[in-house]
Amino acid sequence: DSKLMTAGVPAIWLGADAVGPERWKAVLDEAREKNWPELALYLQDEPGDQQRIDNAKRLFAKLDQFKKDHPEHRKVRSTTAIGSTGIKALGSQYDIWIAGAGFDESLVKSSKKMNKLLWSYDCNLAPVDAESSRFYFGMWCWKTGIKGSALWAYADPGNTSSTAWDAVLNDVTNTELHYSFVRPMPHALVPPIGWASVRQGIAYHRYLATPPNPPPP
């Protein structure tokens, strides 16, 4: 509804693994009716140990049955933040791999060989580090050929409890948000230089990815 998403760019449905197939159908039906962008189901965050891998397999069994029961949603895609252990165990099942930044060319080749969409995220960039933010969203993403990138968080209070933001809102001036690219102030949310550099990096990426104009006939 906000028009901030465009066709061809999947939106991640965080928390899809917290509900079941009945809710999946309700939300996906709504998405089709209202012509939303594609929703990719986020199933089991960071499956890097056996317990998480086993839970992901349980969720994929549900997803497989869901696609059989509701063929109109048979093309729904799955995703998660994933590393080498998770890819080895489950890479063939996830449609979109969201890998931590810093991976090498072998992962790019593996994703292409397995016909997977490769995205990246980073939680090590600093809001005061303009150069690295610009490089990550610009040259690095273009050079690797990945199709999506993101910071860990625009603003992260540190946990997911219902009261997580209370301390921040009660003292915005003296609260520092870790892994965040915004500074909450009493009058507004103030973006640091790192956030401005993200925008520059995106502009550079667009420039690099745009084919040059052909010479006139």
PLM segments and residue spans:
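A general structural detector for well-ordered alpha-helical segments in enzyme core domains, enriched
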Residues: 23-30, 55-63, 107, 136-140
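Eukaryote-skewed repeat-based solenoidal scaffolds used as protein-protein interaction platforms
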Residues: 46, 54-119, 124
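Catalytic domains of carbohydrate-active enzymes that cleave complex glycans
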Residues: 1-50, 61-85, 161-217
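The substrate-binding groove and active-site-proximal loops of carbohydrate-active enzymes
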Residues: 10-19, 40-53, 94-100, 121-132
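Catalytic-core region of carbohydrate-active enzymes that cleave or remodel glycosidic bonds
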Residues: 91, 96-174
